[in-house]
Amino acid sequence: MKQRNVKKKKAKTPQQLRKEALQTLQKLVRLKSADDQGYCTCVSCGVVKRWNEGIQGGHFIPKGSSSFWSLEEENIHPQCISCNQFGMKHGDAAQRYTIYMQEMYGKNFVNQMLADAKKPKKLYSADYRDMIADWKEQIKEQLNRLGDN
């Protein structure tokens, strides 16, 4: 009898799971924000593009500077690539995003977000796996809504 070399699937590290969770949530936010034809509007400049073509899930509070808000839906909204990658640092996209956030959630909530930005938030591998599973289910529902399944 031949012995097979079956590679055991290595468990993902918390960092790998966090990255997957971020990507999954950003996709979900874009899908939820899309109209029935699959188009999203950039919260910073107003450009309209298909949810999966030139639109990203932009973070109001940068994901690298806040573990507290990085995986919260209220912190992520559709942004075109230009605004998300370049405009937040070199243009006025950040100011326009702030105005959007204040109109959407109110100044008090935005101020609380900014105050909480440096708070630590400890998540474990199981937390990430649960979030990913939940968000993937919601993604399926949104894709069905758009007929993109």
Positions of predicted regions on the chain:
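A boundary/linker detector
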Residues: 1-28, 33, 47-48, 113-149
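Short cysteine-rich loop/turn motifs with clustered Cys
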Residues: 23-56, 80
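Short beta-strand-alpha-helix junction that forms the catalytic/metal-binding core
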Residues: 40, 66-87
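Cys/His-coordinated zinc-binding microdomains
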Residues: 46-47, 61, 84
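Short Cys/His-rich "knuckle" micro-motifs
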Residues: 52-60, 90-94
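Juxtamembrane non-transmembrane "cap" segments at the membrane-aqueous interface
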Residues: 97-98
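Short, surface-exposed acidic
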Residues: 105-115
